[in-house]
Amino acid sequence: MVQFITIPTPIDYQDSLMLMEDYVNKVIDGEAPEAVYLVEHLDVYTAGTNYKQEELLNHNNIPVIYTGRGGKFTFHGAGQRVIYPILNLALPNRTKDLKLYVRMLEEWIINSLDIFGIKAYIIKNKVGIWVKTNDDIPSKIAAIGVRVRKWVTYHGIAINISTDLSKFNGIIPCGLENSLVTSLNQLGVYIEMTEFDKILEVEFIKIFK
């Protein structure tokens, strides 16, 4: 059974990376069960393996960390739920297919948002989860960037709950120029992080049996 582990206070990105990589090694060695970490980071810009330096516009004294996950620049900070599924795709009940895994992550988040009346969707060739705001313009509500080691997944998803969206102005999010970002709060949904986590766990079980 996959266990959900919540870090109750905001955590430094580097500290969470060490925690995550240590747990990945334990799963690979058969010393720990699969898990989903739920965290909230201190303000940080992270760059994936496909980043371009010109996509960092102005870091405004926010730390910048270059990571091994897929994707480009994104922001993590207060009011954002970051989800790190550490799953073993080599297990008999899973599939060694990274594209399928990402599609399952997308479905999980889309279904979770639907509980709140938010109709989210994916856009071809644009990684992440999108919604249409009042002006009918696509806005990203969740970013996805994953990595796999010996078929054990790590890194994951960042969903904007009550995030200060102005912090995204320092980057070109995910390398998509002129793209907009949004949050549950901006869409009129106000919910405690712990309540959102409960929905995530319920919907996770439906997708990752």
Swiss-Prot record:
Residues 30-209 form the BPL/LPL catalytic domain. Its EC number is 2.3.1.181. Pathway: Protein modification; protein lipoylation via endogenous pathway; protein N(6)-(lipoyl)lysine from octanoyl-[acyl-carrier-protein]: step 1/2. Its main location: cytoplasm. The keyword Transport does not apply. Substrate binds at R69, G70, G71, K72, F73, T74, F75, H76, A143, I144, G145, G156, I157, A158. It comes from the Bacteria. Coiled coil: none annotated. InterPro entries: aa-tRNA-synth_II/BPL/LPL (IPR045864), BPL_LPL_catalytic (IPR004143), Octanoyltransferase (IPR000544), Octanoyltransferase_CS (IPR020605). Gene3D superfamilies: Bira Bifunctional Protein, Domain 2. It is an enzyme of class 2 (transferase). Pfam families: LplA-B_cat. It is found in: Cytoplasm. The active site is at C174. Transmembrane segments: none annotated. It catalyses: octanoyl-[ACP] + L-lysyl-[protein] = N(6)-octanoyl-L-lysyl-[protein] + holo-[ACP] + H(+). One of its GO terms (biological process) is protein modification process. Keywords: Acyltransferase, Cytoplasm, Transferase. One of its GO terms (molecular function) is lipoyl(octanoyl) transferase activity. Catalyzes the transfer of endogenously produced octanoic acid from octanoyl-acyl-carrier-protein onto the lipoyl domains of lipoate-dependent enzymes. Lipoyl-ACP can also act as a substrate although octanoyl-ACP is likely to be the physiological substrate. NCBIfam families: lipB, PRK14341.1, PRK14345.1. Belongs to the LipB family. In the reaction, the free carboxyl group of octanoic acid is attached via an amide linkage to the epsilon-amino group of a specific lysine residue of lipoyl domains of lipoate-dependent enzymes. This is Octanoyltransferase. It comes from Rickettsia bellii (strain OSU 85-389). The gene is lipB.
